Amino acid sequence: MSEKILINKLPTRTWNRLGVNETPIVWGQTEDLGAEQITAAGQTERLEISDCADAEYSGKTVNIHAHEGQTVTVFETLKAEKNLLVRTALHIEKNAKVRLVQIQNAAQDSLLRLETSGECAENGQVELIQILLGRGDVYSDGHFELNGDGAGFNADIGYLGQNSRTIDINLAVNHHGQKTTSEINAAGALKDDAKKIFRGTIDFRRGSAGSVGNEQETVLMLGDGVVNKTVPLILCAEENVVGNHGATIGELDEDTLFYFESRGISAEEAENIMARAAIERLARTIGDEAAQTAILAELEEVL
């Protein structure tokens, strides 16, 4: 039995008519695929997570624990065929770091839900990379708590939306400790009739003096039917903090198209080249040859 649920909720509501406070989806009884526990320091762990062929809705839990002074790197390749929920929880102790790379590699008519959370102690660090390749609908909900002084969070998100697919992202970083930092960067392209919402929230809680948070999104719109909603939000209950947000939203201009055409590249090819750019950039900066090869190969298939 399935029912309508609300996900990706903004921490502070805005006008209902904007349609960004939360997202309704249909979800049903979830087949539990078990839990993974990852603590290996100084190593790269690779998880390939798929849904259950015999269930309409599947769910997987991943717990990642970085002990004091350790670094843990995890690659999650997410292969939904139907409806898949992946919950990933990060626990970062003092002077530790978790690097999490999530790669969407889902089927055409699938629905992928990502629920990612993290808690950082003093000088703990999180690096989150999400690569959303444009097949199936994807809903990503992230919540991170910078509890200790000097804790830091960095996110790089690359996406490609095409056909009538939906990309719905909610990311909230709460600054609790002093001199904490957050950097959120999202970039991608929308084609055909794709829809995308990006909600980025930086919340400076009382006691977070000396903290800095920045968020930036760059969106390339490549179709008359695309729908883009960008919702940057900075909340502040503390003095002596710095928060910045910005967004760049645009289309391919005539000069750029002329540049490509003068080199024998059609307008359609030019759009595809530009649409690939954000994901190709991330693929080449993750520092893992196997993952880079897989991402670029998948990108060739979807575009």
Label every PLM stretch briefly:
Residues M1-A53:
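Long, low-complexity, mixed-charge
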Residues G34-F258, S262-I265, I286, Q292-L303:
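Conserved beta-strand/loop scaffold segments within soluble protein domains that form the structured core
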Residues Y259-R281:
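Extended amphipathic alpha-helical segments enriched in small hydrophobics
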